[in-house]
């Protein structure tokens, strides 16, 4: 597109064999040889070509920003599914630990029943509680496998191919105490969707200038320089030199309003792009504010869940000790064990939700991802 600002130069060479008609006076057949250069230049007086270059450059930047948007979305989806995987693993670990604890409780109740210190209903209630916990484990295992498979597919691998790589105990990644959103201008500069919308607006604005320039006269200059001769050997001689210069000024005098309508249509397209950009900015700011509020609430919720889980563990241990000492009934043991399982499971869910909302916040801010992150993840997976 930039080449439109400069003259175009072409070179040519050829030979022509001709014979005149007999009824206008027959002349001997002759061959004419020629070689030379032609140059043409449309001077960009009113900026139409420059506006076209600006529009093309802005379109290219918008496409690049759209690609960045896809990359950010992919990285966010990978991170979210990884958190889902860790959540299922944590909840599975909690369920299995509680299953082991309830099995111990069942054994204690069975011994007390054999010693005549507990009723048979206590044994059956302990067994019921244990089996209810066992029944919830398969669903968590299915969720874990689904998260592993989804993560593999997102990284371009076949389902199940990451199972060995992701094996082992993996804690939740740490989270920052606070996230600085920065000023709105920072968000506008970072978010790929807003960059794409702004570049689209710039392209449509440039096209308005391009349409306007078409309504004004165009100035064209031309030049040719070469040689002509009746023999190839004579080309290049002083007598064979030929040259010319030309110039033209052209303007549309009447087109039925076509060019004027083109300007009006493009102006409407530019207005649509402006409205889309403004709407995108407001939606982005709203998304950031909502994500900040959600993350702040998540941190408070996690702190409360941690305290509740700690208290539930202490209560479960105390009630078991009291029961073994004959100072508490078995219903209290069952109640505190169920409360502990629920509190620990809710804590794991809250921990995962907080990190998922942090991912949403980073995505809303248009930052938080290092350049090339998707490519690096793919390389690690392939190796």
Task: Label each PLM-derived region with a short phrase.
Residues 1-3, 35, 49, 55, ...:
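Amphipathic alpha-helical coiled-coil scaffold segments and their short linker/junction regions
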Residues 2-3, 29, 43-71, 97, ...:
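Sec/SRP-type N-terminal targeting helices
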Residues 12-38, 161-180, 209, 222-262, ...:
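Small/polar, glycine/serine/threonine/aspartate-rich low-complexity segments that form flexible
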Residues 49, 58, 65-183, 294, ...:
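Periplasmic alpha-helical coiled-coil/stalk elements that build and connect Gram-negative outer-membrane
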Residues 113-117, 323-327, 364-368:
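A short glycine-centered flexible hinge/capping loop motif at secondary-structure junctions
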Residues 153, 157-158, 360-370:
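Long amphipathic alpha-helical coiled-coil segments
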Residues 316-354:
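C-terminal structured "cap/appendage" subdomains that terminate the fold
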